[in-house]
Amino acid sequence: MDSFTFQYPVKQYFGKGCLETALNAEMPKMGNKVMLAYGGGSLKRSGLYDRIRKMLEAAGKTVVDFSGIMPNPTYAKVQEGAKIARENNVDFILAVGGGSVIDCCKIVSIQAKTDEDIWSMQYGKERRMATDCIPMGAIVTASGTGAEQNNGAVITNEELKLKQPLFGAFNSFAVLDSDLTLTLPMKQVISGAFDTLSHCMETYMGRPAHTNLTDEINEAIMRNVIKNIRALIADPDNDFARGELMWASAMAENSILKLGKITDFQCHMLEHAVGAYTDCNHGAGLAIIHPTLYRHMLDEGAEKLAAMAENVWGITEGTEKEKAAKGVDALESFIREIGMPSRWCEIGVTDENLLRKAADSTVLTPGCAKRFTHDELFEILKETM
């Protein structure tokens, strides 16, 4: 394990029905004007919007709405939110939703405090990070991304045709109340849970390859995610399984699993590039790419793929490379078992030219066991059409 320094800023409120406790504790710290940020109409249809707004207003807060945050949030939406925050002198941002809402607000939080363009700042020659931000907190209604746990955000720049990470504010607190996920469509729940599994795999497959304490914690979380996805499919009202998946999502992205490692995340970077051109569902894209990408790195990644096969999928027979291959087969079978797609055509992506552009614009990650070329990434995308 490599050396590291660790300090973690996000306060966690976890548990069934913990929303009121969390907000009552945090509202006195929010200032007078709170921007309530959310996605579409489901928050209002479920009654959660009125519930949260009434609590804020009862505490004397002026509430400013920022709505319509889409899946795969755009940079234009970030600018819209920053404008609303500036014009209304917002003191605090309360993001209510899943990863897209929370990611968007992390960047709104810093863009609202500077006249400089955040994208140009972080991807320009100087590669500077903004330091001033509007404080924010998150109420999670769709787990899987772990977005509430860190300051990274994935934003689509439609003008540049890029879907890339930006870095903004940390949440001062996160509310993980499994009751708030009950109205979410099962397809979305499973997609989010697979994203959690992907985060774990992408961290596990990083460097150094030898297994350490954080890898062993990771193996336990992966087993837990697999078990609880199956439990939730068998019984969608299984609140225990929902809570377990919510906490697994948090654990996958609160940096614990990444201590002492350089993470892989080549699959994520490739999916982000495809998403910039197709606006595909993130979890679905990951499910399509993972098995084929791993087969392309069976030689270079055999040690960790074999360890994952044995310690996560229970495969004990065969040579290291044979176990690695069987583990990838087990992953692919699980993807089919839980109803996730395994081909781009299943989600309406059929344009090979777009996949070529996506491959060519993909960030090549230093933590991956294999140093892929853009041409080989394109071959992976073609094999999964």
Where do the PLM segments sit?
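Short glycine/serine/threonine-rich phosphate/pyrophosphate-binding segments
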Residues: L19-A22, R45-L48, Y75-V78, S100-C105, ...
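Short Gly/Thr/Asp-enriched flexible loops that form oxyanion-binding sites at enzyme active sites
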Residues: R51-I52, A82, V101-D115, Q149-G152
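Glycine/serine-rich anion-binding loops at beta->alpha junctions
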Residues: V90-K106, T141-A147, Y277-C280
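A glycine/threonine-rich phosphate-anchoring loop and its flanking beta-alpha core
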Residues: K113-L213, A307
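Active-site segments that bind and position negatively charged phosphate/pyrophosphate groups
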Residues: T203, R207-A330
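C-terminal charged capping/lid subdomain of soluble metabolic enzymes
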Residues: L305, V312-M385
